[in-house]
Every structure is written in structure tokens, then in C-alpha cells.
């Protein structure tokens, strides 16, 4: 029987959508060592401080925390290291031009497996000011209250 295909999400960066306005997203492959893959399969990773950058025509992911593999020996990987991203050349150039434009950064949103291969969802994002964050929270809260009022009205109206 053929294996089931699908995604297994390992880590998400929930703070990114709060701190940044997302412009566009890309899916990139990761160049990892064996112990990093095994540690990710255990669901252990943190994207909170992570960011991506372009250097000499290559994309890199930095400050992503993948803890050491529990059963690893002396051959374990460093916890925080630069990891190469696998993207098409056009995508790298688009990312580089946006970041060079100013005010933009590249943040990881999600780390997951697709058919056994580790992928990361990257976002070109612009930092939010404090008042933007408050306004977003206010809008979300107003929407939640309106939905709650509508659902209670529907229940009482029936």
C-alpha cells in the first residue's frame, strides 16, 4: 500500500503575525544534518528569534533553535547555527530586493515536513508599530464580540 502523503507541522511562530505585517510567503527547503532531522521529528524546535537573510546569492536561516537529539552522541549538531535555505534563484532575488528596499525582514512562520522533507514557510514582513498592534487586537476583539452577539441572537430567534 502506498504511504499517506501529508504535512506534519513541527513548530509555528505565532508571535510573527502579531509583530509583523505579512507581505508575501515562500516555501523553502532546509539543509539539515541527521540529528537535526531526528530532533525535528520529535517535534522540538523554536522559531521565535529566527530570521532569514541573503548572503552571496544564497538564502540562510539563522537563530532558529533546534535542540540536540536526545540519543545523539558526540556527533550532535550545534543548537543555533546558520542553515542553508533551498529556494529558486528568482525567489532569492525577490527576497533580497525587498529586504534591501528597507523596512522589510524575512521571518519564519512555520516549520513542517512534507513527504519526509523538512520545509519552512518564510514571510517577507514589515514590523508593526505599537499602535498598529493595539488596533489589530481591538479589531479582533470587536469581531469576536459581534460574532458572539450574532450567535446568541440566532439562538434566541429560533
From Swiss-Prot:
Keywords: Cytoplasm, RNA-binding
Localization of this protein: Cytoplasm
Disordered, as annotated region: 131-158
InterPro entries: SmpB, SsrA-bd_prot, SsrA-bd_prot_CS
Main location group: cytoplasm
PROSITE patterns in the cross-refs: SSRP
Keyword Cytoplasm assigned: yes
Ranges in coiled-coil conformation: none
GO molecular function, one term: RNA binding
GO cellular component: cytosol
Domain of life: Bacteria
Pfam families the record matches: SmpB
Function description: Required for rescue of stalled ribosomes mediated by trans-translation. Binds to transfer-messenger RNA (tmRNA), required for stable association of tmRNA with ribosomes. tmRNA and SmpB together mimic tRNA shape, replacing the anticodon stem-loop with SmpB. tmRNA is encoded by the ssrA gene; the 2 termini fold to resemble tRNA(Ala) and it encodes a 'tag peptide', a short internal open reading frame. During trans-translation Ala-aminoacylated tmRNA acts like a tRNA, entering the A-site of stalled ribosomes, displacing the stalled mRNA.
Family: Belongs to the SmpB family.
Protein name (Swiss-Prot/TrEMBL): SsrA-binding protein
Species annotation: Clavibacter michiganensis subsp. michiganensis (strain NCPPB 382)
Lineage: Bacteria, Bacillati, Actinomycetota, Actinomycetes, Micrococcales
The gene coding this protein: smpB
Amino acid at each position: 500500500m502506498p504511504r499517506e502523503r501529508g504535512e506534519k507541522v513541527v513548530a509555528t511562530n505565532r508571535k510573527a503575525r502579531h509583530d509583523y505585517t505579512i507581505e508575501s510567503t515562500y516555501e523553502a527547503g532546509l539543509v539539515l544534518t541527521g540529528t537535526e532531522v531526528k530532533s525535528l521529528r520529535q517535534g522540538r524546535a523554536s522559531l521565535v528569534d529566527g530570521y532569514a537573510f541573503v548572503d552571496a546569492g544564497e538564502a540562510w536561516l539563522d537563530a532558529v533553535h533546534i535542540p540536540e537529539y536526545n540519543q545523539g552522541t558526540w556527533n550532535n549538531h550545534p543548537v543555533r547555527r546558520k542553515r542553508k535555505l533551498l529556494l529558486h534563484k528568482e525567489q532569492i532575488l525577490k527576497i533580497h530586493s525587498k529586504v534591501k528596499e528597507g523596512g522589510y525582514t524575512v521571518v519564519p512562520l512555520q516549520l513542517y515536513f512534507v513527504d519526509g522533507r523538512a520545509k519552512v514557510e518564510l514571510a517577507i514582513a514589515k514590523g508593526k508599530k505599537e499602535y498598529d498592534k493595539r488596533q489589530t487586537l481591538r479589531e479582533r476583539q470587536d469581531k469576536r464580540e459581534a460574532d458572539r452577539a450574532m450567535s446568541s441572537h440566532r439562538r434566541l430567534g429560533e
